[in-house]
Regions:
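Structural motif
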Residues: 71-93, 203-219
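Conserved acidic residues
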Residues: 97-99, 169, 223-226
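Extracytoplasmic "Venus flytrap"
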Residues: 36-62, 73-82, 178-182, 232-235
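Short, low-complexity disordered leader/linker segments with a strong preference
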Residues: 1-36, 61, 65
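Beta-alpha junction/loop-to-helix N-cap segments that form part of ligand/metal-binding clefts
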Residues: 77-136, 230-245, 249-252
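An alpha-beta-alpha
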Residues: 37, 55, 146-193
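Pocket-lining segment of extracytoplasmic ligand-binding domains
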Residues: 174, 180-249
Length: 252
């Protein structure tokens, strides 16, 4: 019951990025005990770091603060799906009151590990919850899991690229083959690219060590690159930007 009540307090404010509007920890912590929350972050980069810090700040605003009535355990998968699964399994075995999963692979792993338990999962930075099987087709939560999406405005991106590069023909996309969020985004680019006079060229990687070579090959074939919410690729973004600058290929 404690887990369910905590989840109700937290998820109501997720869309706004802070935890508001459903009472405070003082209202729900009838046993005056501490809550234990596990944060599973898929990779180390700025946008996901901001998600983590924003979540912790939101907890504090709701009256849940480390060292007082809250214990937080943060684990980073270093962009490895097997590690994300292990982290999720560990949180479940430790009987956390709630798991916060940051990015699609970590969210999928947390859901799969916690599905037959009473541990709720709150996710963020998930591009398409339906495609990741974290929500139904009508956008309803699946089990005790809910969260927010960071889906890209693909058509707006294509419009901008066409406006800035009127002669461009081919857009390159680097992506991680195991990230469902990237597969979905590529489908969206391929769906709309022809409407704006583009073709899409992709290069897949399985880890950050492959990014440099994949980027070098892709840069020879395209007029520009566009970036996805791909955690492995974003982790290697400084390398990609350096290569693109040398090749005089713009990156969006």
């Amino acid at each position: 019951m404690k887990k369910k009540v905590l989840a109700m307090v937290l998820v109501m404010g997720m869309a706004a990025g802070v935890l508001t509007g459903c009472g405070t920890a003082k209202d729900v912590s009838a046993d005056n005990g501490k809550y234990a929350i596990g944060i599973s972050q898929f990779a180390e980069h700025g946008s996901l770091d901001n998600c983590r810090e924003g979540f912790i700040e939101g907890l504090k605003e709701e009256g849940l603060e480390e060292g007082k009535n809250l214990e937080i355990k943060v684990s980073n998968a270093d962009a490895d799906t097997a590690t994300a699964a292990q982290i999720a399994d560990n949180f479940v075995s430790e009987d956390m009151d709630l798991i916060c999963a940051i990015a699609t692979p970590s969210a999928q792993a947390a859901y799969n590990s916690a599905v037959n338990t009473e541990i709720p999962v709150v996710y963020t930075a998930v591009t398409n919850p339906e495609e990741a099987e974290l929500a139904t087709e009508d956008k309803m939560p699946v089990g005790a899991v809910t969260g927010t999406s960071d889906q890209l405005p693909v058509e707006a991106q294509l419009q901008m690229i066409r406006k800035l590069l009127p002669k461009a023909k081919t857009i390159g996309i680097l992506y991680t083959t195991s990230e469902a969020n990237s597969a979905y985004s590529i489908k969206q680019y391929e769906k709309y690219a022809e409407d704006y006079g583009f073709t899409i060229e992709t290069a897949g990687v399985t880890n950050t060590s492959e990014v440099s070579l994949a980027a070098a090959g892709l840069l020879e074939k395209v007029d520009c690159l566009t970036n996805l919410t791909d955690n492995t690729v974003v982790s290697a973004l400084p390398t990609i930007l350096s290569q693109a600058e040398e090749a005089k290929i713009p990156v969006f």
